[in-house]
Amino acid sequence: MTRGFTPSLPVEFPKMGSFRRPRPRFMSSPALSDLPRFQAARQALQLSSNSAWNSVQTAVINVFKGGGLQSNELYALNENIRRLLKSELGSFITDYFQNQLLAKGLLFVEEKIKLCEGENRIEVLAEVWDHFFTETLPTLQAIFYPVQGQELTIRQISLLGFRDLVLLKVKLEDLLLLAQPQLPSSIVQMLLILQSVHEPTGPSEGYLQLEELVKQVVSPFLGISEDRGLSGPTYTLARRHSRVRPKVTLLNYASPITPVSRPLNEMALTPLTEQEGEAYLEKCGSVRRHTVANAHSDIQLLAMATMMHSGLGEESGGEDKCLLLQPSFPPPHRQCSSEPNITDGPDEPEQGATGSQEDSELNCASLS
């Protein structure tokens, strides 16, 4: 019996999806027919930026001319500036405001002041400053409120522009001397506010010229003077209309203070610091800083103040300047006047008491 041969049939299994990700279909390069559409979109964006900037420029010039903002105009200007910050012009808004808009707006202010002569120019300058400080400056800050995080703020840029483009071009040196008895308070306010604005690169020539004007109307005056012999600026304290004759007074007090070396470039107007820490307590022997044992130092300060102002009842003299000099015993930091003297050993107080007075001289020079 022969076995029949049964042909095998192919078995079909259910097909599963491929685990391999399909190849991405790359877009073909844009056709030449799409270029007009791209150019039209870019031109529309540029037109939108130009329209936004033109609205800002028109509003700023109108503010300098004495006008104000319309209803809801401030919101629209802020939105336009936010849109400009996101565009290609975003990094140039501050520079364009400083070099173009501010210069053009302050030109109207300068021309208004130069139309007057003599003492009338002082009065017009006071009125212009009042309007600029109370109306124009706050409006400019509100318009450019979205512009933040710059090296100089809109307020500082505007005040520096008023100083350089208006005040220093009016030439008030002679006018301030003539109008000294009846000088408007707005002029003094203007000079002090402009003096408080500093450039990030240090005192400029315009700042030094401004200080010469402040020096004529403010007494006592504390300012910065450039000394060619020193590496940095020098702080000068000047007093006008002094009633004492120019003289140099040397106050000498014997005090057991050990001189400590101090670098020359360190400013004399460093802030007061108090000694703290365990090492200080061990050195002073757990003695409180404020004791009666060191009351002579307070007496020295009172004597200094009395001798400096002892000539107030004398006849009037010329201009008086008091230079803030470094004492001959400069410590590494300024200590409080009632701080006890600290010695390194028990034998040093007697030695310090019999030492030379040259190491403990306190120099106060009153020069003219």
From Swiss-Prot:
GO terms for biological process: cellular response to oxidative stress; negative regulation of protein phosphorylation; negative regulation of signal transduction; positive regulation of intracellular protein transport; positive regulation of mRNA catabolic process; regulation of fibroblast migration; TORC2 signaling. Interacts with the mammalian target of rapamycin complex 2 (mTORC2) which contains MTOR, MLST8, PRR5, RICTOR, MAPKAP1 and DEPTOR. Interacts with RFFL. Interacts (via C-terminus) with ZFP36 (via C-terminus); this interaction may accelerate ZFP36-mediated mRNA decay during stress. Interacts with RICTOR. This is Proline-rich protein 5-like. InterPro entries: Bit61/PRR5. The keyword Ubl conjugation applies. One of its GO terms (cellular component) is TORC2 complex. The modification Phosphoserine is found at S28. The gene is PRR5L.
